[in-house]
From Swiss-Prot:
Similarity comment: Belongs to the NAD-dependent DNA ligase family. LigA subfamily.
Function in brief: DNA ligase that catalyzes the formation of phosphodiester linkages between 5'-phosphoryl and 3'-hydroxyl groups in double-stranded DNA using NAD as a coenzyme and as the energy source for the reaction. It is essential for DNA replication and repair of damaged DNA.
Major enzyme class: ligase
Lineage, top ranks: Bacteria, Pseudomonadati, Pseudomonadota, Gammaproteobacteria, Oceanospirillales
GO cellular component, one term: cytosol
Official protein name in the record: DNA ligase
InterPro entries: BRCT_dom, BRCT_dom_sf, DisA/LigA_HHH, DNA_ligase, DNA_ligase_AS, DNA_ligase_CS, DNAligase_adenylation, DNAligase_N
Enzyme Commission number(s) of this protein: 6.5.1.2
Catalytic reactions on record: NAD(+) + (deoxyribonucleotide)n-3'-hydroxyl + 5'-phospho-(deoxyribonucleotide)m = (deoxyribonucleotide)n+m + AMP + beta-nicotinamide D-nucleotide
């Protein structure tokens, strides 16, 4: 490898310094000082030198933004400090209430004015950047707030994220948080290019940014003109300024982009003025926003105010109303979802709203249709709720034509003809066809074959879809008529795997009553409820004949669940499917009815969270249920104890805050050993 001449090394250093300076002016300050052609010439020369003298390439060179080879997946990384979400304000009064709460907690006078740092709320992807000694070492998505995906290789392709901080005085370790987004012009260019190639276009810039960041090949990410805007810091070692505004200003001096619309406001009224101003210029901004964020400016006051479980008390996001437009309602169709929900869909005269052309919109349910008094032929107002999902929000009554037609709920399922029922207390009408309805067929069979139901090994979702599409099965019962030659010719199936599948289907005939009930897919009947039903109604005939009054006498069965169960067993199609399953040989041993009152954990509510080394979460829940405990998905003051494994998150924190007893895995094992005698067979 030849030695680098001094003159070349000097030119190299000058090129990098010059290019970094232009990147800063272009991407961070939005104030370019040279034409694009001149910038391209500088980059070409830098690449030429590095190609001739590869030993000169450094991780922070401007040329290293183009991604490396594709990754095989993303590693999960825990955030040292949680990346919490913000509480929302939707009305001006919500913001005034927030300001009042802040002043009350700080014991300020009623007429005191708190200083707030105000910024537009970018509609992008939250990201955490970690700098060590000024060098970017890691980029992680927000994820669930406690842990996210390591997308460092992709983050390094975002041109306004410095690979090395400018200047000096930055902390030895500094976590910077912000939003990665796709500017409107870049979004339009990507979609225009995709449309020209006949490819699927993105719905909105946020989806495009998310899809770009999660590319396993950073070279694809590099082709997208993503940008980042910083809004806060997380963990850091050293000192930073004492206000939100000054911290962001300091980040800008270190080479990171902050929002040029950032402003200080004194008191709630100035915050409202800022909100109205940003809303008025929203469409002129080069990026999508969905509101503004207000943060108490002084860091010491932020620390005094603290946090609730999921959000800081010192910040709030004031959301904008969704974009709206008027158009004509041409028709209302009723669609049947995979769970049987019968949903009205408005067919509209196409209208451009919120950046897209909308021709369909949700009407949610019949209650909403009645509330709006919707007629076919009406002029309606369409809103893109959350700037994503179009919905009908109102009717322009004075434009109703004389021939407008009211919208009635269908009495029968538009797919299978079964009764459409709407139970008291429920807004959604549902097809009662259950296992029979073809709209629900694939999902019904997937559920029937799942591990917690009939546990048919090897019958995954994709194979179910293939079997239905090839018309080899049309109901759960038809699974038991399959023969090995029927499936041997399917994708990724051979004679051996086909026979293994048939053997697994045959083995599933021997099950338990609780599993069979769960496998039927009755609405509101989960695994725990199925076990309750099997204990309370130990034969199929007793369960089929149970009235709603009988059902609500069973533990934890409420009137809504009882209504669903009763409705299911009243439908002839469902009874025929059950008979077909029994005729195919599905059976279970007689249920041994246990008295839960004598079980050691009777009357106690337990919660399982985190990762256990020797038990899946479902196994742990099952063991607790068999000891008489009621297993809940959330922690409250009524929780008896929490079983917490590794990486336990917010549930563990809440349990500790409430003083609820916490068992680690060793203590859980000890509990099981103490009551081993009660862990008998399954219902």
């Amino acid at each position: 490898m030849s030695e680098v001449p001094a003159a070349i090394q000097e030119e190299l250093n000058t090129l990098r310094e010059t290019i970094n300076d232009h990147n800063y002016r272009y991407y961070t300050l939005d104030d370019p000082s040279i034409p694009d052609a001149e910038y391209d010439r500088l980059m070409r020369r830098l690449r030429e030198i590095e190609a001739e003298f590869p030993q000169t390439i450094t991780p922070d060179s401007p040329t290293q933004r183009v991604g490396a080879a594709p990754a095989e997946g993303f590693e999960t990384v825990s955030h040292r400090l949680p990346m919490l979400s913000l509480d929302n304000a939707f009305e001006e009064q919500d913001l005034l209430d927030f300001d009042r709460r802040v002043r009350e907690r700080l014991k300020e006078a009623e007429d005191a004015r708190i200083d707030y740092c105000c910024e537009p709320k970018l509609d992008g992807i939250a990201i955490s950047l970690l700098y060590r000694d000024g060098y970017l070492v890691r980029g992680v998505t927000r994820g669930d707030g406690s842990a996210g995906e390591d997308i460092t290789a992709n983050v390094k392709t975002v041109k306004n994220i410095p690979l090395k901080l400018r200047g000096e005085g930055y902390p030895a370790e500094l976590e910077v948080r912000g939003e990665i987004y796709l500017p409107k012009a870049a979004f339009d260019a990507i979609n225009k290019d995709a449309a020209a190639k006949g490819e699927k276009t993105f719905v909105n810039p946020r989806n495009a940014a998310a899809g770009s960041l999660r590319q396993l090949d950073p070279r694809i990410t590099a082709k997208r003109a993503l940008e980042m805007c910083c809004y806060s810091v997380g963990y850091f070692e050293g000192e930073l300024p004492g206000t939100q505004h000054d911290i962001l200003t300091q980040l800008q001096q270190w080479g990171l982009k902050i929002n040029s619309q950032m402003k200080l406001a004194s008191g709630a009224q100035e915050c409202l003025d800022y909100y109205r101003h940003i809303m008025s210029v929203r469409d002129q901004l080069p990026y999508e926003i969905d509101g503004v964020v207000f943060k108490v400016n002084r860091i010491d006051l932020q620390q005094e105010l603290g946090f609730v479980s999921r959000a800081p008390r010192w910040a709030i996001a004031h959301k904008f109303p969704a974009h709206e437009e008027m158009t004509e309602l041409l028709a209302v169709d009723f669609q049947v979802g995979r769970t049987g929900a019968v949903t009205p869909v408005a067919r509209l005269k196409p209208v451009f709203v919120g950046g897209v052309t909308v021709s369909n919109a949700t009407l949610h349910n019949m209650d909403e249709i009645r509330r709006l008094d919707v007629h076919i032929g009406d002029t309606v107002i369409i809103r893109r709720a959350g700037d994503v999902i179009p919905q009908v929000v109102s009717v322009v009554q004075d434009r109703r034509p004389e021939n407008a037609v009211p919208v009635d709920r269908p009495e029968h399922c538009p797919v299978c003809g079964s009764d459409v029922l709407q139970l008291e207390g429920e807004a959604v009408a549902r097809c009662s066809g259950g296992l029979y309805c073809s709209a629900q067929r694939k999902e019904a069979i997937k559920h029937f074959a799942s591990r917690k139901a009939m546990d048919i090994d090897g019958l995954g979702d994709r194979l179910v879809e293939l079997l239905v599409e090839k018309e080899l099965i049309d109901s759960p019962a038809s699974l038991y008529s399959l023969k090995a030659p029927d499936v041997a010719g399917l994708e990724r199936m051979g004679e051996k795997s086909a026979q293994n599948l048939i053997n697994a289907i045959e083995a599933s005939k021997q099950t338990t009553f609780a599993r069979f009930i769960y496998a039927l897919g009755i609405r509101e009947v989960g695994e725990a409820t199925a076990k309750v039903l099997a204990q309370h109604f130990p034969t199929l005939d007793l369960l089929k004949q149970a009235t709603e009054e009988d059902l609500v006498e069973a533990p934890d069965i409420g009137p809504i669940s009882a209504g669903h169960i009763r409705s299911f067993f009243q439908q002839e199609h469902n009874l025929e499917t059950i008979d077909a399953l029994l005729n195919q040989g599905v059976s279970w041993p007689e249920v041994v009815v246990r008295s839960t009152e004598t079980l050691p954990l009777s009357g106690q509510t337990a919660v399982v969270t985190g990762v256990l080394a020797d038990y899946s979460r479902d196994e742990a829940k099952d063991l607790l249920t068999r000891l008489g405990a009621k297993v809940s998905g959330s922690v409250s003051a009524k929780t008896g104890f929490v079983v917490a494994g590794e990486k336990a998150g917010s549930k563990l924190t809440k349990a500790q805050d409430l003083g609820v007893k916490v068992l680690d895995e060793d203590a859980f094992k000890q509990l099981l050993e103490e009551h081993q005698a009660h862990l008998g067979g399954e219902a």
